[in-house]
């Protein structure tokens, strides 16, 4: 709770008007979260994200008496719940915001919510939906043409998308992680404040393809961030950096026999610029890769190599700078007999790897991201990255990780 108050102070210094107490904080701290924020910020509008779906009157009363000015209920709740919540909001002098998160037909529902008399409707794409590539702007644009109720918007907004939200009709812009997870909360809030106040002065940036966005995110985050986002999974075992450097690319897979370097070298001609060649060679005592192959890979624009097996010509390979991750180095190689196959599913470092999976390597090792979940997991890794940046900032101020995260309180019992 102390961290939340400090973050709120820094956000206000950057220009934030309202303080939203999010659902996880309310669930962990109860109504005391609202009371604490009200005491700390007596002159600010306090928004309590209760996500009420039943007993609307009781939960609005609880939040109002704790100090909330605006209470959020789920827009998908039954009309009887919403009407009773409205009666309670009028009784206790607070405003009611209906949240459209996961509403089956949000455009139809917003018309009904306006007719019921709610004060605000929040066009909200949840965090898990954001990870799948959804954003609220298109929906907000459509809804703003149908109703006159005041519209709020939430869901992964930053300085860039906040501009689009204002232009699409939002009167309230709710920003979460892009402020609270920043290592400079005040500056992050200030940038968004400036975007909201002067939307025409901000140049809207866009990424041309999903693949490009995935690669840009993966270049920014670490393999540790990615493994955390995958619930501690995805990491190859026994694979270590030989030639250090960040590696991001899509997999071209090779299955071959001990020391047989025909298929690994042929894969260079099949791979495209930005691909990572992933090789399972079965034996760590005979090399299937060396200096000449590395030169060839550089000529094709290959992003890097992962080899469960051995590499040789280390003095030469290290000078070339191509990121290579392997399980061993030896001086001896085998012969190019041509056994094996290219671009079939393989197991490398204990991880299943399919052609097209995203492969990321750095100083910590290598992780495999299934292609079908690449966008989602890249976005989740970015959230882990932002959270850790915030923790680093708090540790730099003199705290310890255990104190900041209140580990004893949250140990599993």
From Swiss-Prot:
Database matches in Gene3D superfamilies: Aldolase class I, Ribonuclease E inhibitor RraA/RraA-like
SUPFAM superfamilies per UniProt: Ribulose-phoshate binding barrel, RraA-like
Highest rank taxon of the organism: Archaea
GO biological process: 'de novo' pyrimidine nucleobase biosynthetic process; L-ascorbic acid catabolic process
Keyword annotations of the record: Carbohydrate metabolism, Lyase
Catalysis: reaction(s): D-ribulose 5-phosphate + formaldehyde = D-arabino-hex-3-ulose 6-phosphate
InterPro entries to which the protein is assigned, alphabetical: 3-hexulose-6-phosphate_synth (IPR017553), Aldolase_TIM (IPR013785), Bifunct_HPS/DMK_prd (IPR017120), HPS/KGPDC (IPR041710), OMPdeCOase_dom (IPR001754), RibuloseP-bd_barrel (IPR011060), RraA/RraA-like (IPR005493), RraA/RraA-like_sf (IPR036704)
Enzyme class: lyase
Molecular function, one GO term: orotidine-5'-phosphate decarboxylase activity
EC numbers, comma separated: 4.1.2.43
Record family assignment: Belongs to the HPS/KGPDC family. HPS subfamily.
Function noted in UniProt: Catalyzes the condensation of ribulose 5-phosphate with formaldehyde to form 3-hexulose 6-phosphate.
Protein name listed in UniProt: 3-hexulose-6-phosphate synthase
């Amino acid at each position: 709770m102390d961290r939340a108050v400090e973050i709120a102070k820094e956000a206000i210094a950057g220009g934030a008007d309202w303080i939203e107490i999010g659902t996880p904080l309310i669930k962990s701290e109860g109504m005391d979260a609202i009371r604490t924020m009200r005491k700390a910020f007596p002159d600010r509008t306090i928004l309590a994200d209760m996500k009420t779906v039943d007993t609307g009157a009781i939960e609005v009363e609880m939040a109002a008496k704790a100090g909330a000015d605006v209470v959020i209920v789920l827009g998908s709740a039954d009309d009887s719940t919403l009407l009773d919540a409205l009666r309670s909001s009028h009784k206790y002098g607070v405003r009611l915001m209906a949240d459209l998160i996961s509403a089956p037909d949000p455009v139809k529902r917003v018309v009904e919510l306006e007719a019921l008399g709610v004060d605000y409707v929040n066009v909200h794409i949840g965090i898990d939906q954001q990870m799948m590539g959804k954003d609220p702007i298109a929906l907000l644009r459509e809804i703003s043409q149908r109703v006159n109720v005041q519209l709020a918007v939430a869901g992964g907004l930053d300085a860039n998308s906040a501009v689009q939200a204002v232009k699409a009709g939002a009167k309230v812009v709710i920003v979460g992680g892009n402020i609270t997870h920043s290592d400079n909360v005040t500056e992050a809030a200030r940038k968004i404040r400036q975007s909201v106040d002067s939307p025409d002065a901000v140049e809207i940036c866009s990424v041309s393809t999903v693949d490009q966005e995935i690669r840009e995110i993966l270049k920014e985050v670490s393999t540790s961030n990615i493994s955390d986002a995958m619930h501690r999974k995805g990491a190859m075992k026994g694979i270590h950096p030989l030639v250090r450097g960040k590696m991001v690319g899509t997999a071209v897979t090779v299955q071959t026999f001990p020391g047989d370097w025909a298929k690994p070298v042929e894969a260079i001609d099949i791979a495209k610029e930005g691909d990572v060649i992933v090789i399972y060679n079965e034996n760590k005592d005979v090399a299937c890769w060396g200096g000449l192959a590395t030169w060839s890979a550089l000529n094709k624009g290959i992003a890097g190599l992962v080899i469960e097996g051995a590499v040789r010509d280390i003095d030469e390979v290290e000078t070339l700078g191509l990121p290579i991750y392997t399980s061993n180095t030896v001086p001896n190689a085998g012969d190019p007999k041509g056994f094996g196959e290219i671009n079939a599913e393989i197991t490398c470092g204990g991880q299943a790897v399919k052609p097209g999976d995203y492969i990321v390597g750095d100083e910590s090792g290598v992780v495999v991201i299934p292609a079908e979940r690449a966008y989602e997991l890249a976005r989740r890794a970015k959230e882990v990255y932002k959270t850790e940046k915030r923790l680093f900032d708090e540790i730099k101020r003199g705290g310890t990780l255990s104190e900041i995260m209140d580990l004893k309180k949250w140990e599993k019992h």
